[in-house]
Amino acid sequence: MRFMITCRIPVEKGNESAKAASLDSTIQSIMEELKPEAAYFSEIEGARSGYLVVNIDDASQISAIAETLFLGLGATIQVHRVMTPEELGQATPAIEQAAQKKDG
């Protein structure tokens, strides 16, 4: 299953890593370990942040991914199940059926 992980690096930790010239190597190491389908970096509430789309076959993998981000970057994370438009299309009949049961 595809998940989007949003990670927020505390400003102090990000600054320390940037000053030590280790921020890029830490992020590259995490990218090699997690092998995201897509990765984007930005800011959230003024802090360095990233959006990683990863495939997770077993929910138990989430803990290992979280620890990688906690230990490597001191990051706080959010994990959300995401779908492509095609996957959403496949889910639509079940969504509509559930909505009709709720109304019924």
Residue locations for each model-derived region?
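Conserved, structured core segments of small domains
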Residues: 1-104
